[in-house]
Design a protein with these regions (language model features):
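Alpha-helical repeat/alpha-solenoid scaffolds of the HEAT/ARM/MIF4G superfamily
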Residues: 72-189, 351, 355, 359-477, ...
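Core helices of alpha-solenoid repeat scaffolds
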Residues: 4-8, 35-43, 75-87, 101, ...
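Helix-loop junctions that connect tandem helical modules in alpha-solenoid scaffolds
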Residues: 11-18, 42-51, 86-97, 123-136, ...
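Hydrophobic residues within the alpha-helices of tandem HEAT/HEAT-like
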Residues: 30-34, 62-70, 105-113, 136-148, ...
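Extended alpha-helical scaffold segments
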Residues: 133-157, 161, 165-186, 195-216, ...
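Extended alpha-helical scaffolding segments
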Residues: 82, 100, 316-363, 367-393, ...
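Alpha-solenoid helical-repeat scaffolds
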Residues: 178-185, 201, 205, 209-219, ...
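N-terminal "cap/leader" segments of large eukaryotic alpha-helical scaffolds
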Residues: 1-49, 160-163, 167-170, 174-181, ...
Length: 951
């Protein structure tokens, strides 16, 4: 269809109003039209004032796209004409529609940047009149945003950066002049709407210029923090004025406050602001004065003022950013090193942040500020520890600060009534409590064992179930820090509290899951105690195991998880209660949930593994018979999803029996008759392989008495359903039994050939199978190289298949194939030699763009191995260099972007590099970018720089 105005208007109408299928076609056609050369002409026709807003917006968007993507289509002599048209369009749409005006301003910004921002002031002069002031602000605001988002070549970016650095001083001065009206006297009446709007626009513009990140951060004089303090004070004053008159200001007052605080955050943190501690302290003191007024407003829990909470959220975000950027100055101020008024103000700001963390009410029902501070506590404790650096003690003042924080976290962990929470609120609260758990560990890094003392005190002082549950939640968060081998009394006291709650589930139903979490989390600590303390710990652990078992009917998932952890880490009490645990595991009512049942089976396995064999074997037999019966029943049923639950239960039990190979062997022997039925059903083959894999992992060399049956099951299952789990079983058979069992040869050959036949039709369709196959072959080549003789008849086909897998899009299969070919090059070059030229060609195709660039590292390892290989059967002069040269010889290969100079540089660097994978990866990376036409772009510069940093 021709790109006429009429056709384009019709397509836009279909896109906005048609059916889904028609809209998709219209979108495709309209997108193609944006790239057409005719677009430079039809955009102006579609932008006429008589056209609809949707059509005007499409035209403005097309203009922006053309300037970004098709700038090379504009001859230099047409730049002036395009500039005039852009300015006329921007001025013509000064009164809207707003979305069209904004898009035209962005287009003008892109035009300016495509010319390296030269003559910036001259280009924008027509917008400098009072009536066009808002347009000028809009264009100035989007220029830095467009600069950050645009893809441009390195030279053009450097040119733009220099021009923007030069212009930024004037722009920020202009914004400051606009914001300084906040210093006027507003004691009798509030600022009018026009003034408020001007503050919003000026703050947005200044923030945009300050927020150019990284290497592109503006480095003019106005970007040093001391010189930005005047701007910061103007922004703070604007917020203070608007907050003072909040009841009489327009609805845009909060938006203006948020814009000012966003700009203030940028001014406080960008441009190496942390190099100026004195200015930072002054800034934090000013922020404290502002926050003191806003944050001290009482928070009404019954009727939350969400408009005010939006302002508080913006202010807290700003304060947190300033404190995180200037943490060192803040630490010194709190410790009294900076004793002037500014230092006191910074210390006051920290107290206000603690108060915000302890905001009354429940998150997210009554407030949304307390979740903004968690990153500050991490940064603060990290700076305190770095400054101490093991050479000096932490200042005692931090004990008080982090004690306050810990108490606040305990309070904020309290959960509201479930009826008050929507599903979304429940998820927010779950994430919030996880953040609280992390912050508790920050407290531990400063307070150490005192954390348990503070938490125990909070539990003792609690007068509601919710408060006690919150203390237990914090106690559970500290479990990873429990001192193994030591017995702090407050820790034991809290664990006793958790035990009492778990032992009386009806009395504390809401606290029960948290109490059970405590029992399980401290299981490893209980198991670490010895001597007199160990005796007390063993008794306590036994009580914990009994309590977890008794709580199963009331909180099955939490109790089962706690029981599993306790049985795994506290062997003596688990062994003593093994019979009870096995009985509970067989209880159908408790075991209905599959996840819970797996936890119970794992707990039973750990308890049996800790017991004497004569006592454990009969108990295990009852479990094994039950599982075998379930597997048999599922194998005889017609349900397609059958068997998975029983098989996963077998896996859980077998994994827990790993410390007792004799019991693992008993279990496998009992399961073998049922397992023999599974290869007859394709959907049960993979569950069978999972059981065999975990059985071999638990038994290791002790699998030999049953290896014949395992091998037969593996071959039978793999013939019916080749899958990755089956190849994992083959790998374990070879590793554990290859030297003692002659049948390993047949099992390996049968399964490898079956996998190769499956992949030969379409390797990309089964990436997981390809990954597993070449992971198996890599393990055989490296650990059991003689086993390659077993598959020698198909080795050539496997090599050719691996060459195809090198360029599949799924990274797992490609990476495994490259790894095996590299190992083969080091150990069996004669097997790889016939395919080497084709492999070199495939590698070039892949580097050139036939596969994702994420696979370049695996290809680099392969090229390095090929270059190091000793090609004993190669003709004179043959090797990686000749094969790569032959592959690169055709013009335009692998892409038209790869010039002869690029190819020669790549070839030379690859051939000479035989030792450093890092240097070879840089060469491959650079050639890959060249093949994609990206070699001189900003993206290429950042990519190569990132590789250098990682190296």
């Amino acid at each position: 269809m021709e790109y006429t105005a009429q056709n384009l208007e019709y397509a836009v109408s279909v896109f906005y109003n048609g059916e889904q299928a028609e809209r998709t076609k219209a979108h495709t056609w309209l997108t193609t039209a944006q790239r057409a050369p005719e677009a430079w002409n039809f955009v102006w026709e579609l932008m006429q004032p008589t056209k609809g807003t949707e059509i005007q917006f499409y035209a403005a968007t097309t203009l922006h796209t053309k300037i970004l993507r098709c700038w090379n289509e504009v001859p230099e002599e047409s730049y002036e004409e395009l500039k005039q048209k852009l300015l006329q369009a921007v001025i013509g749409y000064a009164k809207g529609p707003i979305i069209v005006t904004n898009r035209l301003c962005i287009s003008l910004a892109a035009f300016i940047l495509q010319q390296g921002s030269k003559d910036l002031a001259e280009i924008l002069r027509p917008l400098s009149t009072p009536e066009n002031a808002s347009l000028l602000l809009e264009v100035l605001t989007v220029i830095p945003e467009e600069y950050t988002s645009m893809t441009m070549r390195t030279a053009l970016r450097s040119k733009n950066r220099a021009a923007l650095n030069q212009a930024s001083h004037m722009v920020l001065d202009d914004m400051l002049r606009c914001l300084q009206t906040a210093f006027n006297d507003y004691s009798k009446e509030p600022p009018n709407k026009a003034t408020i709007l001007s503050w919003t626009n000026a703050a947005n513009c200044a923030a945009s210029w300050l927020n150019i990140d990284g290497e592109d951060s503006l480095e003019c004089g106005a970007t040093t923090l001391p010189e930005r303090l005047t701007l910061c004070r103007a922004l703070q004053t604007a917020v203070h004025v608007l907050y003072t008159w909040s009841s009489q200001c327009s609805d845009g007052a909060v938006e203006t406050c948020e814009a000012c605080l966003l700009c203030l955050r940028a001014a406080a943190t960008t441009g190496a602001a942390d190099r100026y501690p004195a200015a930072a302290l002054q800034l934090m003191a000013d922020l404290a004065a502002l926050a003191d007024r806003v944050l001290q407003t009482p928070l009404d829990i019954d009727t939350p003022d969400w408009i005010n909470e939006e302002l508080v959220t913006a202010l807290v975000t700003c304060c947190v950013a300033a404190c995180e950027c200037h943490t060192r100055a803040l630490v010194l101020a709190v410790e009294g090193v900076e004793s002037d008024a500014a230092g006191g103000g910074a210390a006051r700001l920290l107290q206000l942040m603690l108060a915000a963390q302890a905001a009354p009410g429940h998150y997210p029902l009554h407030e949304t500020r307390s979740n903004l501070l968690f990153s500050l506590w991490y940064t603060l404790q990290d700076e305190i520890l770095n400054m101490a650096d093991g050479k000096s003690k932490i200042n005692p003042i931090w004990q008080d600060v982090f004690t306050q924080l810990l108490l606040a976290l305990i309070k904020k962990s309290e959960m509201p009534a479930e009826s008050a929470l929507s599903r979304d609120d429940q998820e927010l609260l779950r994430c919030y409590r996880q953040d609280v758990s992390d912050a508790v560990m920050y407290c531990f890094s400063i307070l150490g064992d005192r954390c348990w003392e503070v938490t125990a005190g909070a539990y003792a002082a609690a007068n509601t179930e919710a408060a006690r549950e919150a203390a237990l939640h914090v106690f559970a968060s500290l479990a990873d820090a429990a001192p193994h081998g030591r017995y702090p009394p407050p820790l034991a006291e809290l664990l006793q509290h958790a035990l009492r709650v778990a032992a009386t589930p009806q009395a504390n139903p809401r606290a029960l899951p948290t109490a059970l979490e405590c029992l399980g989390s401290y299981a490893s600590w209980l198991g670490s105690l010895e001597g007199e303390e160990g005796g007390a710990a063993a008794a306590l652990a036994g009580a914990c195991v009994r309590a977890a078992g008794a709580a199963l009917p009331h909180s099955p998932a939490a109790a089962a998880l706690a029981l599993r952890k306790l049985c795994a880490d506290c062997s003596a009490p688990a062994a003593a209660l093994a019979a009870d645990i096995v009985f509970v595991t067989q209880n159908a009512d408790v075991g209905r949930d599959l996840w819970t049942r797996r936890q119970l089976l794992s707990a039973a396995g750990a308890a049996l593994a800790a017991s004497e064999l004569t006592r454990a074997a009969p108990l295990l037999r009852t479990l094994a018979d039950q599982l075998a019966a379930e597997l048999t029943q599922k194998a005889n049923s017609s349900g397609r999803g059958a068997g998975c639950g029983a098989a996963k239960g077998c896996v859980a039990l077998m994994g827990a029996l790993a410390p007792a190979p004799a019991l693992a062997a008993h279990l496998l022997r009992a399961l073998l008759p049922a397992l023999a039925l599974l290869p007859q059903h394709q959907h049960l083959v993979e569950p069978m392989f999972n059981i065999l894999k975990h059985s071999l992992s638990s038994l290791m060399a002790d699998c030999l008495p049953m290896i014949n049956e395992i091998g037969e099951l593996t071959v039978a299952g793999f013939k019916l359903h080749p899958c990755p789990a089956g190849l994992d079983v083959v790998k374990l058979i070879v590793l554990f039994a290859a030297d003692e069992w002659g049948g390993a040869c047949d099992v390996t050959r049968e399964c490898v050939c079956a996998a190769a036949r499956t992949l030969a039709t379409d390797a990309a369709a089964a990436p997981d199978l390809a990954d597993a196959l070449y992971t198996l072959l890599l393990a055989l080549t490296r650990k059991k190289p003689h086993t390659l003789d077993w598959i020698d008849p198909v080795l050539h086909d496997l090599v050719n298949l691996a060459c195809e897998c090198v360029r599949v899009w799924e990274s797992g299969g490609a990476r495994a194939a490259c790894g095996w070919l590299a190992a083969l090059a080091a150990r069996r070059t004669n097997a790889l030699r016939p395919a080497a030229p084709a492999l070199a060609h495939q590698a070039i195709c892949t580097i050139g763009g036939a596969a994702p660039r994420a696979q370049l590292e695996a290809l680099t390892e392969l090229l390095l191995a090929l270059n190091r290989a000793q090609w004993t059967e190669a003709k004179e002069g043959e090797g990686l260099g000749s094969w790569l040269a032959a592959a690169l010889a055709p013009p335009g290969f692998p892409t038209a972007h790869a010039t002869p100079a690029h190819k020669n540089k790549f070839l030379t660097n690859v051939i000479k590099e035989r030792s450093s994978k890092r240097r070879l990866l840089e060469t491959v990376q650079e050639f890959s970018l060249a093949c994609r036409g990206l070699i001189d772009t900003e993206y290429a510069r950042q990519t190569l720089a990132a590789k250098s940093i990682v190296a």
